[in-house]
Amino acid sequence: MLGFTINKPDVEGVFIKRINRFLGIGLINGVESLVHIHDPGRLKELLKPGIKFYAYHKDSGKTRFYLTAVDLGNELVLINSAIHNNVAAWLIENGLILKGYEVLRREPRFSGGRFDLMLKSPKGGYTMVEVKGVTLEEDGVAKFPDAPTLRGARHMIKLAKAIEEGYEAYVIFLVLRSNALLFTPNVSLDPRFSNALKYAIEHGVKVLAYKLALTRDWVLLPMGRVNVIL
């Protein structure tokens, strides 16, 4: 249980610019190429012109490259929200968070939508979980979100509804910046999400933040829980 291993990227490039939410342009082997970005955040402090990135080569689709991490020199930062649920499930299954809980289902249906995970608690009840990846860090403080997210706010309200219907509920923030010491909601950027999170907590939803560091061997090392400041 050293860490969560991700597939080693097979492409290196230099980022040029972001076109839209899921597309960017990078210089790969001297050629400007479209790159898929699987993260809805703004990522302005990460996806800067000239930054080195790592990606996977794709054999099909509109874009032939799938960005997965950026190199800040002193740390690699994962930019791939597609694996966040798997990382959270791994932490749970290895007893690093929510010890004694069992992962029953990925993307369980609830109230016309889906949560990220459904767990079975040590007491036999059921727990709904939302997972959020955190890539924004300022002066040792990790913040979420880095762009306004109506969808994220709705998730918090639905977690509160799950409590009302007899479930236990958690929101897990995966802090993906190695220098982060604390986590806090990004109130100034997205007060709507922050208010929704507070509403969820008032209704019994529990919050935890856990830090992981990406090594140059492409392993996410568990670094432990970080304090949550609301």
Curated annotation (Swiss-Prot):
Pfam families: SfsA, SfsA_N. HAMAP family: SfsA. One of its GO terms (molecular function) is DNA binding. This is Sugar fermentation stimulation protein homolog. PANTHER family: SUGAR FERMENTATION STIMULATION PROTEIN A. InterPro entries: SfsA, SfsA_C, SfsA_N. Belongs to the SfsA family.
